[in-house]
């Protein structure tokens, strides 16, 4: 039988694991239950969550049973890594609705090309809400080491900088450890999966299971997806645009374009992390790439096609492919009215202008520009094209001939930003 752990290591999908020899042994002996938790702290997962999700899917493909724990309770607390802001606690009023949305996203991905796979989705609110404080502190709290929590890097940093740490934050580690104890006791779970920043929480859970249930259990962490500045890609950091899995928040076209623009040095790492293309095929592609038998765009397209298909399905992928072809590889004179209607449903930016709006107004109102000063700057720098013709007048007003089929105008800003104007009959 294929060595699943070695396959995951070959793909650089494992950061740490607690006991490789025994994990391999138990996976050979039987099909196991393993789990990963996802806290519903927003109304969608983002691409950073794809690594652990697809990790679970790989186990599912080998016949093991993934258990997804939606953190309906732990999301109300947050851990030391989550940045707080004024609206932080306010957002959690929506946790119940967010939990359902995230559950549907997870189902679509885990069941991709395998509707019959076994999958269990639970919400830790169901068992944590039943806890009695005295029983919990007496039966569980006595096994949790505050010494270990204080040794966490994020805690040491906060203490050194004299930052406030609430009891609520400490409780997060206790409750996450309790999840593992509960799941081992009631669902026979043997492995917990988490991002590399969750290592200490996973170890706390393992210790708790060992001490109370007297069972040997394990943990595996996956690498984190980081931003260009090295920080963890997450919804709490708005320095760079977050790529969400919900097409209402990040359109399928934007999602597809994100992967099409993957830097050359990350293409093959991402093919290993995010696709089910075999390692032998990836290595062949890599050889062709370095021998210049295929160009970077061809490799990027394979990556974008595969990930978009997994997350959004084949029909949405086809739509994103067609929109990309129309916008980048066809002359605007070659586009039919049907092509424009297709573009209008593809997920590119759409704006319905008023008849008295000039170019600056439209750039700002369509969110192609942040302000009128910014709009003026991009116009004067020759960065704006209207129906593929450069426009340098800051007071330009749209005329009848700018409205293709008396309905559409395509604005392009720079090399990659588009907005389709759809004119109403005034």
Swiss-Prot record:
Motif ('KMSKS' region): 232-236
Enzyme class, first EC level, given as a word: ligase
Residues bound to L-tyrosine: 35, 172, 176
Catalysed transformations (reactions): tRNA(Tyr) + L-tyrosine + ATP = L-tyrosyl-tRNA(Tyr) + AMP + diphosphate + H(+)
Primary residence: cytoplasm
Biological processes per GO annotation: tyrosyl-tRNA aminoacylation
EC number: 6.1.1.1
One GO MF term: ATP binding
Annotated S-S bridges: none
Location relative to the cell: Cytoplasm
Domain S4 RNA-binding: 357-414
Keyword set, alphabetical order: Aminoacyl-tRNA synthetase, ATP-binding, Cytoplasm, Ligase, Nucleotide-binding, Protein biosynthesis, RNA-binding
Source superkingdom: Bacteria
Location of the motif 'HIGH' region: 40-49
Subunit details: Homodimer.
Family that this chain belongs to: Belongs to the class-I aminoacyl-tRNA synthetase family. TyrS type 1 subfamily.
Function field: Catalyzes the attachment of tyrosine to tRNA(Tyr) in a two-step reaction: tyrosine is first activated by ATP to form Tyr-AMP and then transferred to the acceptor end of tRNA(Tyr).
NCBIfam families listed in its UniProt record: tyrS (TIGR00234)
Name of this protein: Tyrosine--tRNA ligase
Protein encoded by which gene: tyrS
């Amino acid at each position: 039988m294929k060595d699943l752990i070695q396959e995951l290591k070959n793909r650089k999908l494992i950061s740490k694991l607690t006991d490789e020899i025994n994990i391999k042994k138990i996976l050979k002996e039987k099909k196991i239950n393993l789990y990963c938790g996802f806290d519903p702290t927003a109304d969608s997962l983002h691409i950073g969550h794809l690594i652990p999700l697809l990790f679970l899917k790989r186990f599912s493909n080998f016949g093991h049973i993934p258990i997804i724990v939606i953190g309906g309770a732990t999301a109300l607390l947050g851990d030391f890594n989550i940045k707080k802001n004024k609206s932080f606690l306010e957002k959690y009023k929506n946790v119940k609705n967010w939990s359902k949305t995230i559950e549907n996203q997870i189902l679509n991905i885990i069941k991709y090309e395998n509707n019959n796979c076994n999958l269990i989705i639970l919400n830790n609110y169901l068992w944590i809400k039943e806890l009695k404080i005295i029983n919990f502190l007496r039966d569980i709290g006595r096994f949790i080491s505050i010494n270990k929590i204080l040794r966490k890097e994020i805690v040491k940093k906060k203490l050194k900088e004299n930052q406030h740490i609430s009891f609520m934050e400490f409780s997060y580690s206790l409750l996450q450890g309790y999840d593992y104890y509960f799941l081992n006791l009631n669902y026979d779970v043997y492995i917990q999966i988490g991002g590399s920043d969750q290592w200490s929480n996973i170890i706390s859970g393992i210790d708790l299971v060992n001490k109370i249930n007297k069972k040997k259990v394990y943990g595996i962490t996956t690498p984190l997806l980081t931003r260009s500045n090295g920080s963890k890609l997450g919804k709490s950091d708005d320095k760079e645009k977050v790529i969400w899995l919900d097409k209402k928040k990040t359109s399928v076209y934007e999602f597809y374009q994100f992967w099409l623009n993957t830097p050359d040095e990350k293409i093959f790492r991402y093919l290993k992390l995010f696709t089910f293309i075999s390692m032998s095929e990836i290595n062949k592609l890599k050889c062709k790439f370095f021998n210049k038998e295929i160009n970077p765009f061809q490799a990027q397209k394979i990556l974008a096609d595969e990930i978009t298909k997994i997350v959004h399905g084949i029909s949405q992928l086809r739509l994103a492919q067609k929109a990309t072809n129309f916008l980048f590889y066809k002359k605007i004179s070659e586009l039919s009215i049907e092509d424009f209607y297709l573009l209008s449903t593809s997920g590119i930016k759409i704006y319905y202008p008023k008849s008295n709006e000039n170019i600056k107004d439209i750039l700002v109102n369509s969110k192609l520009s942040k302000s009128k000063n910014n709009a003026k700057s991009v116009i004067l720098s020759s960065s704006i094209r209207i129906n593929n013709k450069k426009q340098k007048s800051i007071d330009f007003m749209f005329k009848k001939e700018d409205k293709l089929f008396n309905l559409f105008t395509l604005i392009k800003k720079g090399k990659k930003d588009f907005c389709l104007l759809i004119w109403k009959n005034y």
